[in-house]
C-alpha cells in the first residue's frame, strides 16, 4: 500500500514554507504514524496539499496548517480509523491485580 503525501509549495525562500516545514519537523512521529511523506516544492504561491493513499486530493490550504489540524484531518478518514481500531485491538491488554 502507498503512503499519504503532504506537499508544501511556495516561492523560493518563502518564510511560510519554512515555518510549515519546521512545524512538521517538530512532530516526526506523527507523520510516521500516519504513513505520511512530506515534500517541499517550489511554486508561485504558498500552498499545502494533502493526498490520500489512493492519490486523491484530501485537502488544500492556502495558509499555514497546524499539525493538530492536519493530524485530525487524516485521523478522520475511514482507513485511518480502521488502522487505529486494529492497533488498539492488537495492543496488549493490561491486567489489574487486586
Name these PLM-found stretches.
Residues 1-98:
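Non-catalytic interaction/Regulatory regions outside core domains
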Amino acid at each position: 500500500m502507498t503512503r499519504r503525501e503532504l506537499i508544501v509549495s511556495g516561492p523560493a525562500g518563502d518564510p511560510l514554507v519554512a515555518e510549515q516545514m519546521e512545524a512538521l519537523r517538530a512532530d516526526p512521529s506523527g507523520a510516521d504514524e500516519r504513513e505520511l511523506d512530506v515534500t517541499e516544492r517550489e511554486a508561485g504561491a504558498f500552498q499545502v496539499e494533502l493526498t490520500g493513499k489512493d492519490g486523491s486530493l484530501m485537502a488544500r490550504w492556502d495558509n499555514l496548517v497546524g499539525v493538530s489540524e492536519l493530524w485530525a484531518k487524516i485521523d478522520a478518514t475511514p482507513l485511518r480509523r480502521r488502522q487505529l481500531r486494529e492497533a488498539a485491538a492488537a495492543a496488549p491488554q493490561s491486567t489489574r491485580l487486586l
